[in-house]
Curated annotation (Swiss-Prot):
The gene is PPDK2. It comes from Oryza sativa subsp. japonica. This is Pyruvate, phosphate dikinase 2. Formation of phosphoenolpyruvate. It comes from the Eukaryota. InterPro entries: ATP_grasp_subdomain_1, PEP-util_enz_mobile_dom, PEP_util_AS, PEP_util_C, PEP_util_CS, Phosphohistidine_dom_sf, PPDK_AMP/ATP-bd, Pyruvate_phosphate_dikinase. It is found in: Cytoplasm. PROSITE patterns: PEP_ENZYMES_2, PEP_ENZYMES_PHOS_SITE. The keyword Chaperone does not apply.
Amino acid sequence: MAPAAHRDGAAEAVGQRVFHFGKGRSDGNKTMKDLLGGKGANLAEMASIGLSVPPGFTVSTEACQQYQAQKAMPAGLWDEILAALTWVEGNMGAVLGDPRRPLLLSVRSGAAVSMPGMMDTVLNLGLNDHVVAGLAHRSGERFAYDSYRRFLDMFGNVVMDIPHSLFEEKIEAMKAALGLRNDTELTARDLKELVAQYKNVYVEAKGEEFPSDPKKQLHLSVLAVFNSWDSARAKKYRSINQITGLKGTAVNVQCMVFGNMGDTSGTGVLFTRNPSTGERKLYGEFLVNAQGEDVVAGIRTPQDLDTMKDCMPEPYAELVENCKILESHYKEMMDIEFTVQENRLWMLQCRTGKRTGKGAVKIAVDMVNEGLIDRRSAIKMVEPRHLDQLLHPQFESPSSYGDKVIATGLPASPGAAVGQIVFTADDAEAWHAQGKSVILVRTETSPEDVGGMNAAAGILTARGGMTSHAAVVARGWGKCCVAGCSGIRVNDAEKVVLVADKVLCEGEWLSLNGSTGEVILGKLPLSPPALSGDLGEFMSWVDEVKKLKVKANADTPADALTARNNGAEGIGLCRTEHMFFSSDERIKAMRQMIMAETIEHRQIALDRLLPYQRLDFEGIFRAMDGLPVTIRLLDPPLHEFLPEGNVEDMVRLLSSGNVYTQEEILTRIEKLSEVNPMLGFRGCRLGISYPELTAMQARAIFEAAISMTEQGVKVFPEIMVPLIGTPQELAQQVDVIREVAEKVFANAETTISYKIGSMIEVPRAALIADEIAALAEFFSFGTNDLTQMTFGYSRDDVGKFLPTYLSKGILQNDPFEVFDQKGVGELVKVAVERGRKARPDLEVGICGEHGGEPSSVAFFAKVGLNYVSCSPFRVPIARLAAAQVML
């Protein structure tokens, strides 16, 4: 017998590899996900709180880890599995392989982190020609042979690696020959014939017979689940979702209960709340006379869960009660799989339900208002990526496209998507890599499609319901999906989709409304969403908890306004160079300045640029009224402002004003060309070589600040000098800026408060931060350049080798996306420590791309930064990450 249920299973489970569970008793509990996987831990938990769970056992993730290391069944494990099997047989009064009292098993995977459709499942294990005859005697021939043919298909595909399509061809051919549409119309005699054909597939595909010994079937199935951990699709899913550090998958072996025993049986999947909208109402699907995989795999399009009320009222009432118990117990929205066998309800699985961004925020806010959780728990419940989804665009005018709707499916994952039609996952990835937006159109998706699904802007399937593979994966990613669109027929071979009287080809534009299920012909305009309602309330809780300020990188008044609307507490980086590209007049003046050989000529060009800069700064100060604005002086190499193309084209363009001869221009271009421009003539080196450039920018800032102050706008300008490597560089630029300030203030007969600070992006600057802090009133880490110079990776060329580094495990993440805490992070720690030793009130922030990446934000909060600055659209994500690090 298994040990009785206990709540501290982890402490007593040292060395244990096989864990039992059944109603009212279990070896494990919900805290043991690392060891039992999410599925196994939750089965143990459901059993121990008294829900009807078919008895079974879980083989631990550590056993999988041992198998991966040895590439063989670990010593003694098979004996432990057989002992657990004997316990299950005793509980059920049935025996694996006994025709008189047949026990059938399911074998499922389950890692610590849910990976929908990534791992392999085998149902009805234990059937062979003898056992099926005994099962037929007890439960009817049709049920028995339907179970047998399903098992042959699944076992062949999952364990023996026989393509599912070979089995599908046989059943489709039989239905066509008999003039039938549905599998359920096949008779017992038809199914017997199909079983014979399926067994022949084994011989044709593998050159060997189907293994009829049930214990051999179990042995092979356990190994197949272990092997599925390293399958290409599982690796790809983990890579896309940045899932690392797991030991492997657990194996859950459970006695089968049957939803395909007639009209008093069925199977379903539900969420305790709507995962798309968060509405507090059971949301799910149900199939009468079916097995669980039929719902999840999208093989049959199921009915709404509400239909169960009428056909199975008692199991439905028990199910509703179980959902209340589970939500109250886990304090979470739960995803539940269940089966009804001859009017008896069985709970097969529960896990925390995947949800959209909209659903996540509403569920969190509602659960606080219901008194189920507190605000801090609500903040932990919403993931940064959920906010990313909520900030996705919607259609500008949903009412205007009514006449363009060509089909309607199920609204499987909300949001809007616009793209060109592709029919394969590979094409979706290839087109996406070329910068194209695509809609992946499939009859149904499978786990092999995850790469293409991730690359696509949206997904459209002809078959499958709200809990099909496509729907679950798309919702997890916040990707728009319309599923079960029966009005379309997909022809993969011809690369066309038929919709009513229309034939749509690869490359045609399609728009999807994942909130309504509408499929719209053509390319509709999209508009950004807003922070309001539940999201506004949730973000106010976030701001109560976080200590780290969140600013935005914004170069235009429009960007600044977006940042402010998204809750930014200032501008942490305004890149002045972007302003020079916004009109032909500006870029011409900039090129005139670059081509100038004398201070006088350069000053003429700078005088032309001054009003443009001043105007832009005024707009940004106005948008950020009352909040600080950090302006970085010119940073990029000057050659970036020259026309693109070959030298002859450049010369022709630059000489069109007849100011310089072609020879003079050619000489100047040659002088500006650099072998390694990112480490060359840029940043403060420009301002030191051309002090008049720094002077013009400082003057524009101060004049704009005074102008706005006179109009009643509260202005807090902060001037940031880029690429500082020595205190002498900063001292020279500070002198220029202060001299300009005095002149502007004298002319205007007024003064304003301002700060001068330094970018810390050269590793040397981090190491001598105490010397730089003597002159700088604030630091801002430019983590893009700091990463580039610390690793010695050119950001422009890293794509040539980074994919290899990631695939070989040399790097775990792209260091330009996820901040390197160990190496570059050490420089940040040193700079903060030394800088504050010299200037205790030193304000320190970061303004690289890492400012909006959640794990990076958590690190910056821990090392004592005052703020992070990120793109305007990532501000809410950074705010949430900054709050979560405090919990």
